[in-house]
């Protein structure tokens, strides 16, 4: 069973995504970790039927060919709710790598980096 914190985090993540893609979404979660009042989510937005989103007519339409379809979100719990501190949707770089230092977020919430 999903925890209350998990549901609140994913609701906070869903709001800007649903606004941007003009539809309700669900997520395939690659990584989610919470520590104290911080959380990091790495997820792929999908349609409510679990299919890939058609970005035609959205702000991401031009990016779909050049960038990776990723969603990384850093959240902080303040004043009784989860707030998005930073998010990256469609990118070619792992921009979250600097977030622990830049936002002073606990490094333990982020995925372990693999170096080849």
Predicted regions mapped to residue ranges:
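Short beta-strand edge/turn micro-motifs at domain boundaries
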Residues: 69-101
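Polar low-complexity intrinsically disordered regions enriched in Ser/Thr and small residues
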Residues: 14-17, 53, 60, 111
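Short secondary-structure boundary segments
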Residues: 1, 31-35, 93-94
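Mature extracytoplasmic domains of secretory-pathway proteins
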Residues: 24-79
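Short, non-transmembrane alpha-helical segments in secretory-pathway proteins
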Residues: 1-24
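Extended, polar beta-sheet/loop recognition surfaces of beta-rich domains
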Residues: 96-116
């Amino acid at each position: 069973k999903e925890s209350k914190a998990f549901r609140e985090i994913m609701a906070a993540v869903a709001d800007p995504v649903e606004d941007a893609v003009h539809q309700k979404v669900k997520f395939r979660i690659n990584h989610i970790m919470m520590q104290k009042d911080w959380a990091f989510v790495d997820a792929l937005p999908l349609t409510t039927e679990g299919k890939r989103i058609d970005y035609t007519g959205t702000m991401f339409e031009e990016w779909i060919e050049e960038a990776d379809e990723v969603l990384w979100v850093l959240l902080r719990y303040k004043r009784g709710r989860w707030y998005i501190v930073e998010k990256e949707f469609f990118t070619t770089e792992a921009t979250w790598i600097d977030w622990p230092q830049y936002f002073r977020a606990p490094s333990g919430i982020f995925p372990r980096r693999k170096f080849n």
